[in-house]
Amino acid sequence: MQCNINDIIKILPHSYPFLLVDRVIECDPGMSIKAIKNVTFNEQFFIGHFPGHPIMPGVLIIESLAQASAICVLGKKTVENKVVYFMSIENAKFRKPVTPGDTLILQSNFEGLRLGVYKFKCVASVGKEEVAGATILAKLQDK
């Protein structure tokens, strides 16, 4: 499954400036996803993080991974009155700064489901270099 921004807007409840996935390259719904976030100098967070030395905040890289994971849970179908809530982060690591002009590759792989909580192993890369990673827990719930 592939998705463009118009599909993503229908799947996720997020909107500008907090929609942090631009395209889905491949997705096996419920199992894995590979998506892209194009990082541009026009991002609002670069105004203050950091003036003269723009770096994408690590928490937003993790949020990008969580949004990609939510798309993986939902697939391309619209789930009425449901939303995927980000519940926790485990073992977050930040290895290299992400700067304007980078294409952030978001990879999320399903690791398990327990008591309705999805567990994903996530990695963010620029090119072939890993820039961040974490285990993300999320739950599909009523809105």
From Swiss-Prot:
It is an enzyme of class 4 (lyase). GO terms for biological process: fatty acid biosynthetic process; lipid A biosynthetic process. GO terms for cellular component: cytoplasm; membrane. SUPFAM superfamilies: Thioesterase/thiol ester dehydrase-isomerase. Its EC number is 4.2.1.59. It catalyses: a (3R)-hydroxyacyl-[ACP] = a (2E)-enoyl-[ACP] + H2O. It is found in: Cytoplasm. GO terms for molecular function: (3R)-hydroxyacyl-[acyl-carrier-protein] dehydratase activity. HAMAP family: FabZ. Belongs to the thioester dehydratase family. FabZ subfamily. This is 3-hydroxyacyl-[acyl-carrier-protein] dehydratase FabZ. It comes from Wolbachia pipientis subsp. Culex pipiens (strain wPip).
